[in-house]
């Protein structure tokens, strides 16, 4: 039977519990990528891969609206502002944009805008179309025409104060020109580097022996976020203005007018911004910009469309993290051909064996690429989660033609020595997309994925997925905290901000203490003493000094460290104090810090609600392990068209003594399509009966279902918990940690939204807003909008022509208000 991983399962086939699991996992993954991209300027996936994650999350939220806004990624825009800079709270949030890739999506976007506004196709509707600059978002605040503050996007609400650095950028005026400059004028735009300036900066970096920047975006971000403005001044950063934040008055009523006003004020604006009045015109401009892309001299990754009229923008408003009135139309990924020189395996924090292709360096989209992700074992073999071929080798690519004697069936895998097509979508980690079979060496052999961890020699296994009845795509090391690669990564995760948040323990200290043998598991952090800690740090410093001397061709001198005892001792005391400050920790943070596969922040909070403390959680998992389901029970629900509900009906019928489960009426609501699927899987009626009886004997017990049936936890997470706590060394590590720290249950935060937790129903004709606007406003203020009235309804907003819902409200004693009263409440909120 085909496997269905949570990532592969079509959204339309998901149950509510499966959707919640997938939503939680995706949200946590996206939030981590946001942190790396916006907070560290160090992304690890391509823009296209990130966009795919976002689109799947949005698809889940569209089908399951109750999940919208429940995860960090649903509402987050960037990443928290760095502690290196002063914080600036944006008067108007700096939001992100939704993405589109196909031309039909642009048509759908325009139609969606018209539906929301109630505009017929005959009524004019204008948009602006402008290049999407691949740089760093910036907000400039002018007061009285003078630049007073410049801030990065940060997380959209709070950014970093980079005013001193921005004052060194020649293209950004310190004073705005003109008589119509608003008293308060917040300008939003993008800082970027031209291709020529980027090449010059990297040439200077190479000459000075410093690391090269991967691409202009990273170079621009790194240059702007310098603590020393002198470094920023030495880098020729540029700027395009394209939007407004807080304005005391508006110099224009349209986006196109605003761009004209910015130009009058002396701000640089993109000359390729155009006002369009039809989808055809928008797409024509997109194609024109794509054609000109290579000649622009700076990086762009698409075109941004915005509703031109500000009054309409205000009516359209926002949804989660993006405006309804704007959309980014992304360009396809860029590509090139090169050769795989080696395949290496990196071990991740949770023990995942991650294959990486070492490539003969090649320029892709202006960036020199020497590495590419190979994702997992199946991807190297050229198959998907269902065992279907994902590559077949290509017969034509940039002049390469397939010879007649090359067998396409042998072209699905990736081998060392292969000539491959590499795709890159505006980021640093590209991927191997296909193989040019004509250039495959005669001695190239299929890659043998290791079954032992390259870091510690422990077994590496592909875990059994209880939801699909299949093996996971990722092979993992079972060494846990005894694995050097995994151990350090787990410790880094343990001290990270959203886990134990131990200040000062960065990667360097973790590596130093791990290599010195002082810290091999989390509990060791709480056993550190001053003298051994100091000795390890001093030894590490001396070793690095000796390495630098040897690299410079000098003989290392055996000399004592310079006497900076007071500073050094103070720093070490600060580290120890930071550890001591974490001897009491909320239970959810403790759980998250353990780095258990599938247990992100949201799941950790759910587990902390289920169990009062760690011993109770561990006992609950042990009990779940003792009564977990067998493979026949799992397999029955993983068949095509047969889910958990049908499985329960089949089991109930078998338990009731039904001998022919496919007879009419034997199983409630069993469709003909489901009967066909069952017969295809089990051969005949007797085979089905035997399989269901086996599944009946393998039903999970209550302890397992207590976790697996909970929509916030689910079967996959339950399996991960069982796997983690089944390893004796993991249990020992947790128990050792519990001897050092105390957990406490976190309180429930107060709701911030005005109508938080309330259910609102709209009925009748609404005269001053469309139904979509009303729903969006209610949800923005924290309410849940329902289509029917019940005793659980808190408020009914009734317009003219209200019918049965108004009667239901009277029946249940629900408060009823008019549209005018609702708008007054919204205005006061």
UniProtKB/Swiss-Prot annotation:
SUPFAM superfamilies linked: BRCT domain, DNA ligase/mRNA capping enzyme, catalytic domain, Nucleic acid-binding proteins, RuvA domain 2-like
CDD domains listed in its UniProt record: BRCT_DNA_ligase_like, LIGANc
Chemical reaction(s) catalysed: NAD(+) + (deoxyribonucleotide)n-3'-hydroxyl + 5'-phospho-(deoxyribonucleotide)m = (deoxyribonucleotide)n+m + AMP + beta-nicotinamide D-nucleotide
Residue segments, region Disordered: 1-23
Molecular function GO terms recorded: DNA binding; DNA ligase (NAD+) activity; metal ion binding
InterPro entries, A to Z: BRCT_dom (IPR001357), BRCT_dom_sf (IPR036420), DisA/LigA_HHH (IPR041663), DNA_ligase (IPR001679), DNA_ligase_AS (IPR018239), DNA_ligase_CS (IPR033136), DNAligase_adenylation (IPR013839), DNAligase_N (IPR013840)
EC number: 6.5.1.2
GO cellular component terms, A-Z: cytosol
Active-site residues, record numbering mapped to chain: 132 (n6-amp-lysine intermediate)
Biological process according to GO: DNA repair; DNA replication
Residues that hold NAD(+) according to the record: 47-51, 96-97, 130, 153, 190, 306, 330
Residue ranges of every copy of the BRCT domain listed in the record: 750-829
Chain sites annotated for binding Zn(2+): 453, 456, 477, 483
Residues passing through the membrane, by range: none
Alphabetic keyword roster: DNA damage, DNA repair, DNA replication, Ligase, Magnesium, Manganese, Metal-binding, NAD, Zinc
Cofactor: Mg(2+); Mn(2+)
Role played: DNA ligase that catalyzes the formation of phosphodiester linkages between 5'-phosphoryl and 3'-hydroxyl groups in double-stranded DNA using NAD as a coenzyme and as the energy source for the reaction. It is essential for DNA replication and repair of damaged DNA.
PANTHER family named among the record's database cross-references: CHROMOSOME TRANSMISSION FIDELITY FACTOR 18 (PTHR23389), DNA LIGASE (PTHR23389:SF9)
Similarity annotation: Belongs to the NAD-dependent DNA ligase family. LigA subfamily.
UniProt name for this protein: DNA ligase
Organism: Methylobacterium nodulans (strain LMG 21967 / CNCM I-2342 / ORS 2060)
This protein's encoding gene: ligA
């Amino acid at each position: 039977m085909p496997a269905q991983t949570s990532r592969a399962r079509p959204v339309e086939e998901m149950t509510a519990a499966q959707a919640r699991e997938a939503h939680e996992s995706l949200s946590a993954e996206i939030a981590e990528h946001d942190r790396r991209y916006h907070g560290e300027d160090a992304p690890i996936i391509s823009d296209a891969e990130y966009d795919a994650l976002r689109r799947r999350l949005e698809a889940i939220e569209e089908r399951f609206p109750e999940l919208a806004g429940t995860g960090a990624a649903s509402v987050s825009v960037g990443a928290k502002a760095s502690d290196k800079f002063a914080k600036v709270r944006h008067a108007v949030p700096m939001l992100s944009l939704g993405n589109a890739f196909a031309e039909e999506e642009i048509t759908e976007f325009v139609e969606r805008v018209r539906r929301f506004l109630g505009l017929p196709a005959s009524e004019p509707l204008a948009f602006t179309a402008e290049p999407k600059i691949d740089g760093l978002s910036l907000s400039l605040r002018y007061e009285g025409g003078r630049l007073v503050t410049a801030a990065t996007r940060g997380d959209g609400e709070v950014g970093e104060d980079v005013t001193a650095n921005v004052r060194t950028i020649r293209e950004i005026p310190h004073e705005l020109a003109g008589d119509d400059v608003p008293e308060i004028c917040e300008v939003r735009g993008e800082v970027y580097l031209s291709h020529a300036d980027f090449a010059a900066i990297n040439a200077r970096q190479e000459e000075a022996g410093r690391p090269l920047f991967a691409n202009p975006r990273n170079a621009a971000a790194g240059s702007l976020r310098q603590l020393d403005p002198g470094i920023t001044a030495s880098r020729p950063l540029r700027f395009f203005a394209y939007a407004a934040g807080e304005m005391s008055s508006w110099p224009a009523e349209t986006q196109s007018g605003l761009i004209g006003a910015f130009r009058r004020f002396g701000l640089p604006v993109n000359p390729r911004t155009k006002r369009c009045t039809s989808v055809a015109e928008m797409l024509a401009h997109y194609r024109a910009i794509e054609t000109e892309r290579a000649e622009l001299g700076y990086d762009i990754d698409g075109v941004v469309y915005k509703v031109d009229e500000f009054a309409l923008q205000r009516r359209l408003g926002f949804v989660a993290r993006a405006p309804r009135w704007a959309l980014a139309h992304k360009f396809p990924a860029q590509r090139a051909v090169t050769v795989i020189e080696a395949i290496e395996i990196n071990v991740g924090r949770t023990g995942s064996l991650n294959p990486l292709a070492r490539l003969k360096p090649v320029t892709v989209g202006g960036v020199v690429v020497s590495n590419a992700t190979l994702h997992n074992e199946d991807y190297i073999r050229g198959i998907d989660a269902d065992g279907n071929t994902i590559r077949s080798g290509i017969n034509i690519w940039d002049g390469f033609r397939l010879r007649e004697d090359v067998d396409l069936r042998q072209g699905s895998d990736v081998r060392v020595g292969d000539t491959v097509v590499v795709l890159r979508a505006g980021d640093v980690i590209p991927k191997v997309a296909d193989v040019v079979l004509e250039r495959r060496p005669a001695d190239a052999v299929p890659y043998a994925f290791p079954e032992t961890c390259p870091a510690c020699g422990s077994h590496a296994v592909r875990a059994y997925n209880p939801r699909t009845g299949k093996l996971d795509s990722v092979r993992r090391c079972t060494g846990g905290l005894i694995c050097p690669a995994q151990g350090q990564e787990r410790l880094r995760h343990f001290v990270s901000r959203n886990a134990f948040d131990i200040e000062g323990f960065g990667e360097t200290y973790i590596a130093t203490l791990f290599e010195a043998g002082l810290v091999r598991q989390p509990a060791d952090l709480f056993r550190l003493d001053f003298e051994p800690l100091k000795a390890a740090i001093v030894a590490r410093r001396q070793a690095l000094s000796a390495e630098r001397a040897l690299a410079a061709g000098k003989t290392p001198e055996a000399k004592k460290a310079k006497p900076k005892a007071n500073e050094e001792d103070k720093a070490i005391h600060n580290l120890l104090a930071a550890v001591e400050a974490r001897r009491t920790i909320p239970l959810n943070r403790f759980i998250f810090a353990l780095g258990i596969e599938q247990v992100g922040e949201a799941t950790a909070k759910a587990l902390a609600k289920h169990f009062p403390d760690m011993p109770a959680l561990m006992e609950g998992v042990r009990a779940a392990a003792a009564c977990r389901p067998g493979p026949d029970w799992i397999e029955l629900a993983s068949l095509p068209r047969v889910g958990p509900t049908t499985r329960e009906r089949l089991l109930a019928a078998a338990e009731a003594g039904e001998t022919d489960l496919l007879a009419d009426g034997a199983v409630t609501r069993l469709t003909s399509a489901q009967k066909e699927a069952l017969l295809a899987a089990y051969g005949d009626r007797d085979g089905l009966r035997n399989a269901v009886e086996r599944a009946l004997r393998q039903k999970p017990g209550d302890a397992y279902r207590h976790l697996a049936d909970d929509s916030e936890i689910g079967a996959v997470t339950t399996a991960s918990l069982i796997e983690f706590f089944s390893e004796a060394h993991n249990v020992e590590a947790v128990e050792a940690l519990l001897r050092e720290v105390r957990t406490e249950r976190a309180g429930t935060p107060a709701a911030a939204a005005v109508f938080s937790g309330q259910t609102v129903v709209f009925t009748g004709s609404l005269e001053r807003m469309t139904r979509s606007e009303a729903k969006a406003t209610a949800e923005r203020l924290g309410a849940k909008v329902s289509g029917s009235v019940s005793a659980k309804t808190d408020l009914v907003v009734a317009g003219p022509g209200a019918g049965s819902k108004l009667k239901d409200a009277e029946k249940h004693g629900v408060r009823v208000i008019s549209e005018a009263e609702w708008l007054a409440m919204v205005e006061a909120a």
